[in-house]
Amino acid sequence: GLDDVLTSIRSAENPSPKKRGRKRKEAPAKDFKAVLWASADKLRAQMDAAEYKHLVLGLIFLKYISDTFVEQQQKVLATVSNPESDYYLGDDPADHQEALEDRDYYTQENVFWVPADARWESLRNQAKQPDIGQLIDRALVAIENENPTLRGKLDKRFGAARLEPGRMGELVDLISTI
């Protein structure tokens, strides 16, 4: 269950500092662990570990691919805005926006295409909606439809999760801190 995931995270950490170079930052891993534990605590009383691990890990995956997509967007914008680049498009913001929605810039870098309504920021902005579970499920379906390698692989049980009202939104807000 989730305890196994956390154990593997703990075992992957390197407790000894490097002898040369910059000291390794450990805060992000601790933050990640803290968020995982807080997520588990939010759900533990309402469902068993076998179910809540799918919700938590599914949201983490959704946030990860969305964050990766946004990072690639920033790279694309920097490239098409740079007069020194072979891909320079001039100063017209409309041309830049069009480039940001060109899926080739993402797929050539092995970044999953994430439709606008499925992006984490869009979901986070709707986290307090009573139907956030269904919105997440629809986002996962949209991602599967746009990325053939993911078809049928994403767990879409958010709309059917039996949680207290507002709990799924709290979970989205919590995962947003990672």
Question: Where does each model-flagged region fall?
Answer:
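Non-catalytic, mostly N-terminal accessory regions of nucleic-acid modification and defense proteins
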Residues: 1-178
